[in-house]
Structures are given as structure tokens and as C-alpha cells.
Amino acid sequence: MSIKVDITEPVTAVLDDAHIGHINGAFGTILHGDVAPRKTWKHRLTTLLAILGPGLIVMVGDNDAGAFATYGQAGQNYGTTLLWTLALLIPVLYVNQEMVLRLGAVTGVGHARLIFERFGKFWGAFSVIDLFLLNALTIVTEFIGIALALDYLGLDKTTGVIVSAALIMIAAGTGDFRRFERFAMALVFASLLLVPIYFMVHPPLAQVAHDFVFPQMPVGSKLSDVMLLVIGIVGTTVAPWQLFFQQSYVIDKRITPRFIRYERLDLWIGIALVIIGAVAIMAFTAATFAGQNEAGNFTDAGGIAVGIGKYVGRTAGVMFAIALIDAALIGASAVSLSTAYAIGDVFSARHSLHRKVTDAKGFYAVYGLLIAIAAAVVLTPGSPLGLLTLAVQTLAGVLLPSATVFLLLLCNDKPVLGPWVNSRWLNYFTSAVIAALVLLSIILTASVLFPDATNEQVIIDILVGGGLAAMIVALVAIALSGDAKGGRKAAINDASDAAALSRDTWRMPPLRQLAPAKLSLAAKTWMGVLRLYLVVAGGLVLFRIVMLAIGQG
């Protein structure tokens, strides 16, 4: 039962007034102004049910069509030996997404707009443009997955792709946030279809558990090929669009700092589901192809469906194809929304699922246009779908480190997060993650640019040489943690702002009232190195893709 209490709302930076009001979740409502303590388990449960959504959608949406292919490739080519990569990614997923949910609840402003305001027009424009391009390509891969599943099911590809695109547009365009969230949550629960497939294939549970816990490399496999697949797993599981989506979706759902604890639990549940799905795909694919001629010869997600149908049964193959369509639908919805939210946020345009199409034309135009273009590309004969998939994987690898750097800097920005800035140890961990992502990004970029030269020795040289970069990252982390510590003390001890004494009520003030961002020398160094890296790596990757497109790669 919700208790409505009249309170004085603090002045915040929220850019769209549709982001203020009742929390209307798929499974419950929290009234605007409800500040009553949750003293009973029943009250806590009803609150959690109302909050559920952002974490589940962003995590399960990450198990999209591209993820099906990546995890399936790992299982078909290397068995369950790479399951441990998923275990290592659990803390990375939580730390990254917890930071953005905190930013969303505390600031009320989207990720791209904060980058504009705190780091300038160059980085703001860069973040929006690269997000738009990468997301557009990612959505194409979602419809590739839908087309492959339709082919297996024997359904007309053109009709199926058009119907899927229309369904995604209609679900978001009703002007009812709760209705969209219920649609998304239905897709989330449908993703559990992977679990019965796992039991139908019945891979050896003891082996699956062992390989999930104990790291190892496939025996007799080429290190460079394995490393590239590991990078693919990382890029599939931790993607830039997730940061932008969850921050904006938390804002659109009207979640405030008072409910961050519940949103963190929502995130943990989402992580559990995404790991269960990923483990299931890798494990039952490994068991399906073990000892068969197709083992080690991955083609695409459609090939996995064919193999499951051949060796396990038609029912299991159909279930996999349906799960693939489900994954592509939720992936396309979330990725498109992350782009529309970002553009609306940057231009201070209306950008909320609470608004009808006529009340937020630009927001829905961006959303619908991305879906329509992606569907059209997949249906166009002769489209370079393989090249587009390669471009998505490579660009994601190049851009992910920069997205994490911005995230780390924003979460140490005193005027932005006040008492919610990062702890010292969180900065240490995130900096280590950035170092690892940079190394993996370099390996991925090198493999695309120089496929014939990327052998075991090159990879080892990159990993060893990366130790120096890791040391620099550690120094940056120390500098940032010092700033963060001072930020927390300043926020809590500021007697002129009583709200700062309570983390539950502290919100970022309007953007125009923020003190100018003051970057430390370490942060400025980060930005300079990052800019150089992006110019070089991005330029080389673009050149390579163009060469491949014209047949000279």
C-alpha cells in the first residue's frame, strides 16, 4: 500500500516534465511523493515489483541476435571451455550498469547530455554520432537474426521482417509507458525459452559448472582465433548502447535516488537472467555439435537452429528459432530507444514513452526511422550483411573503452552526483576494467586491420605491453579517487544545502546552475590519449571497412 505524502519537490535538472510523476511499472505503481518507509516485506516486495524493468530489459536485451551468434560460435567451435568468460563479466556488468542507473536516478539527465555539458561539444557530438551509427548497424544485425529464424521456420522473410518492425514501432508508440514495459517484460520472460532447450539437449552439468568456474583455453586451438572470440563475447555482453539506454530509461520511469536500492536489485536479477541465457546457449550448442561434422565449423545462428533440429529434434530447433526472434525484438527495441532518448536529451526535445506520438514527434521519428531502415537493409538483395556484422563488432570494440572512461569521470563529478560519487575501490576496479577493455580493443582492431599478421606472438606482445598502460591507469585511478573522496566530503558537509545530508533526496541541480567542470591533470591526460586513440583506431577501421566494401580488402 502506497502512502502519499505532500513534500516540497527540489529543483532538479530533469529536461522533460513527463519524467516527473507516478512510477507506473509493468507490475505496480508508486505514487509521486510516496516517501513512506518500507517496513514490511510485503511493502518492499510491492515496491520492487513496481521498480522492476530497467535492469531486466537492458540485460536481457543484451542477449540479442548478435549474442546468440557469438555464444553459439563459442559452443560449436570450442565446447564449454570459454564459459568462464561469462563469470568474469558479471562484476563488470554490474559495476558499469550500476553507475549509469545511479547517474539516471540522481541527475534526471541522459548520458549524452551530461557528456555535452561536462566535457564540451566535441565529446558530446562524438558520443551522439558514434552511438547513432553503431546502434543503426546493431539494429540491422537484429533483423538479420529475425530473417535467419524465419528461414528455419519456413516463413516468408519479407512478411516476417515487416511484421516484426511494425510490432516494435507499435509497442513503443502508444503513449503509455506501462504498456511498453509490459511488452518488453513479456519478451524478457520469453527469453527463458532457452532453459527448456538446455534440458532437452541435457549437456553434462558437472562439466558446465567446472568450465564456468575454472578458466582455461581450448586445447589445440589457435590462440589468435580464441582471443578474438573472447573479445567478441566481451563486446557482445558489455555494449555502449546499454549505458545510454539504462540511464535514460531509469529517468523515463521516474525512478529517484530513494529507490536506487531496488533498482540495483532489478539489475542483479537482469544479470542473472542474461548469464543463464548465455550459459544455456553455449552449453547446449556445445553438446549438440559434440562429435558431429559441424563441430568447429560455425556459420551463423540459423546454422545452430538447423543443427539442433537435426540432432535434438524439430521441437527444440523451433524453440531456438522463436527464442532468436524474441531476442532480436527486445534488442532492436532497446537499442532504438537508447538512440532516440540520447538525441531527444541533447536537443532538450520531448523524449518520453509517457508521451503520444503527436506529442513527441522527433523522439518517435528517430525510433521508427532506425527500425524501418534496418528492416529495409536486410530485405534489400545484395546488402553486405556480413560486412555490416563485422563493422558492428569492430566499432563496438573501438568505442567501448571511451564510453567507460566518460562513465568513470561522470561518476566522480562532484556537482553532478554530490554524495553519490564513486567510492575509491569502485574507481580502482573500473580503471582496471578500462585497461582491460583498451587491450582487448587494440587486439580486435589489429585483427581486423591486419588479419594475416595477428598471430599468437602479436597478441602476447600486446598483452605484455599493456602492463605499462595498466600502471598508468592505476595512477589515474588514484587521482580520481582522491577527487571523489573530496567530493563526498564537500557534498555532505555543505551546510548551505540541507538536502545533501540525505542521499535519498539529493538531486543534481539544473544544468545552468552547475559549476564548470574542473578536470584534473590526470583526467585531461585521459581525454588526450583517448582522442588520439579514437582518431587512429577509428580511422584505420573505417579505411579497412571501405576497402572490404569495394573488394580490395
Label the model's feature ranges.
Residues D225-L228, W425-A490, R531-G538, R544:
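A generic transmembrane alpha-helix motif of multi-pass inner-membrane proteins
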Residues V92-V106, V250-I251, A272-G303, L548:
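Extracellular/periplasmic helix-exit of transmembrane alpha-helices
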Residues V128-F132, Y152-G173, L193-L194, K361-I373, ...:
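Transmembrane alpha-helical segments of multi-pass small-molecule transport proteins
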Residues A186, R355-A365, L390-L449, G486-K489:
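C-terminal membrane-solvent junction of multi-pass transporters and transport-like membrane proteins
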Residues K121-F122, T158-V163, I269, T315, ...:
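Loop-to-transmembrane helix boundary motifs in multi-pass membrane proteins
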Residues I30-A36, T70-G75, Q97-W123, R178, ...:
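Flexible loop linkers connecting adjacent transmembrane helices
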Residues F189-M217, M227-Q247, F406-K414, L437-V448, ...:
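Hydrophobic alpha-helical segments and their helix-loop junctions in multi-pass secondary transporters
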Residues V58, T85-R118, F126-L133, L137:
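Juxtamembrane transmembrane-helix boundary signature
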